């Protein structure tokens, strides 16, 4: 212990803490496309601020523990760099922390072992060392604090000196608010403000009114089912030309129309799904705080509305919109199972189709292809093997793709069953399917994985959009079918589903 005390003096602990706090800045200098001079400022100015904070107490461990929120964000930033390869923590990533349930989080973290172990090894010993620093009777001397203060001032002066020409040449990139951790805390503040605004949604949207009416015969039976997909990218659908026939059932249905060029507006579920269901769009997202969903429009037009979800409540706009429905059901998995498969929704669909309502809108929010992929399907959809991975790594890429493709097979089976149920009613009906976003699967040299990255890839944006119309609908409204087929190659974004649902039921 005496030898330990001699090695870990308060001064050495001080410099260890300074280095640890700088680690995210150092990594970001390598991952971000920043001007060279600004990279110097990226180290000097935050580094000086860390020094100034650490000399606030003569025991650096006290300050280090007081800065725990900074270390938490630093650990989060390092994990995201491992996952996405670049970019500062975006506000949507902070919102994902609020809206992602613990089961999903543990499924992912379990496969990110290198990153998680790395941040634990970096921060946990440091926090333990901070406790040791607090308990030691030795303190930093006033002379040491004075010298560190002078060093910090020199670093700030040098940082500003090189910042000025960098900012003059690159005014949009080389900005003080682009320095870590200032940018991360700004994004965190924006996320908290957005979360608070969402909580006020029932009040801010109370007066919204579609004034919707139906132009069709009130006695005409109509049933429309909108299936919200999860993490399904068009590139892995056989229907879209994928080398594997992952959609054999939909391929065999001549009445199924798929749209080739549809992009999601946002690559994160907590925003992309609400934007499917209301008139707001990504460029005018704040409009969502004052709007209600298409569920309210259908209710005003005389439809019985239902929202069935295989996902958990999470306090997002999806939950607010779901509660507008006449019938809202969330399916909870038993304790010994991580998540129910989507076919749990089918029995509820059967019940709704038999309640005797003339006009119905049914929305099914599936779990689709959400990671961990191999847990999203039964054995009869386990076509491609091996399909289990222990960690996210390039050597496991094929097994990961196999599992993902099997989840698409399960989606194909599910949609075919929904179509069959609608077809058997003999009523005027349609089924629309649109995924919320796609997914990265270590596709190229960037080795990107998952979705919701601050800079999305095409794999995250290109999503499948599929429509099926019943024979009765085709007979009554042939122009709609003709128009859909003629426009199946037209570029759309995910707003198309809101407009399509309103149009086919008007």
What are the language-model segments listed below?
Residues 157-226, 231-391, 499-501, 505:
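Active-site-proximal alpha/beta segments of enzymes that process anionic O-linked groups
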Residues 299, 473, 478-505:
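Non-catalytic, well-ordered alpha-helical segments in soluble enzyme domains
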Residues 103, 248, 289-292, 296, ...:
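A structural signal for well-ordered alpha-helical segments within the folded catalytic domains
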Residues 225-226, 407-450, 498-501:
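Metal-dependent active-site segment of extracytoplasmic phospho-/sulfohydrolases and closely related
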Residues 50, 347-350, 388-431, 492-493:
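A long, amphipathic alpha-helix that forms part
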């Amino acid at each position: 212990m005496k030898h330990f005390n001699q090695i870990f003096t308060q001064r050495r602990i001080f410099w260890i803490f300074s280095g640890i706090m700088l680690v995210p800045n150092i990594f970001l200098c390598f991952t971000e496309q920043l001007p060279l001079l600004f990279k110097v400022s990226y180290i000097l100015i935050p580094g000086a601020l860390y020094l100034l904070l650490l000399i606030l107490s003569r025991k650096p461990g006290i300050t280090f523990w007081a800065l725990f929120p900074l270390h938490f964000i630093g650990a989060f930033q390092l994990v995201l760099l491992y996952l996405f390869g670049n970019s500062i923590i975006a506000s949507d990533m902070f919102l994902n922390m609020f809206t992602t349930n613990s089961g999903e989080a543990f499924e992912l973290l379990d496969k990110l072992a290198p990153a998680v172990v790395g941040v634990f090894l970096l921060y946990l010993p440091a926090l333990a060392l901070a406790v040791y620093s607090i308990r030691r009777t030795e303190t930093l001397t006033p002379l040491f604090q004075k010298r560190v203060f002078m060093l910090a001032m020199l670093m700030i002066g040098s940082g500003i000196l090189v910042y000025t020409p960098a900012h003059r040449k690159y005014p949009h990139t080389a900005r003080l608010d682009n320095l870590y951790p200032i940018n991360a805390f700004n994004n965190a503040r924006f996320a908290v403000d957005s979360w608070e605004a969402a909580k006020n949604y029932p009040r801010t949207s109370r007066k919204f009114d579609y004034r919707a009416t139906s132009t069709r015969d009130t006695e005409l039976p109509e049933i429309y089912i909108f299936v919200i997909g999860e993490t399904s990218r068009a590139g892995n659908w056989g229907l879209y030309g994928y080398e594997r026939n992952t959609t054999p059932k939909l391929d065999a249905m001549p009445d199924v129309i798929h749209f080739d060029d549809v992009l999601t507006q946002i690559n994160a579920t907590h925003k992309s799904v609400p934007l499917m269901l209301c008139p707001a769009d990504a460029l005018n997202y704040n409009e969502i705080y004052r709007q209600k969903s298409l569920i309210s429009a259908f209710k005003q037009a005389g439809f019985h509305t239902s929202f069935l979800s295989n996902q958990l409540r999470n306090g997002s706009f999806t939950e607010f919109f779901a509660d507008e429905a006449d019938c809202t059901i969330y399916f909870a998995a038993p304790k010994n199972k991580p998540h129910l498969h989507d076919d749990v929704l089918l029995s509820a669909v059967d019940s709704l189709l038999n309640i005797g309502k003339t006009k119905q809108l049914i929305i099914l929010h599936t779990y689709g292809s959400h990671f961990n992929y191999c847990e999203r399907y039964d054995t009869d959809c386990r076509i491609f093997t091996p399909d289990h991975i222990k960690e996210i790594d390039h050597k496991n890429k094929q097994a990961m793709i196999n599992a993902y493709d099997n989840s698409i097979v399960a989606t194909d089976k599910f949609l075919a069953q929904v179509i069959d149920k609608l077809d058997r009613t003999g009523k005027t009906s349609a089924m629309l399917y649109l995924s919320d976003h796609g997914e990265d699967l270590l596709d190229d040299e960037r080795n990107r994985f998952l979705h919701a990255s601050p800079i999305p890839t095409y794999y995250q944006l290109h999503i499948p959009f599929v429509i099926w119309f019943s024979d009765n609908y085709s007979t009554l409204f042939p122009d709609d079918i003709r128009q859909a087929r003629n426009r199946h190659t037209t570029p759309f974004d995910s707003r198309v589903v809101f407009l399509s649902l309103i149009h086919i039921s008007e």
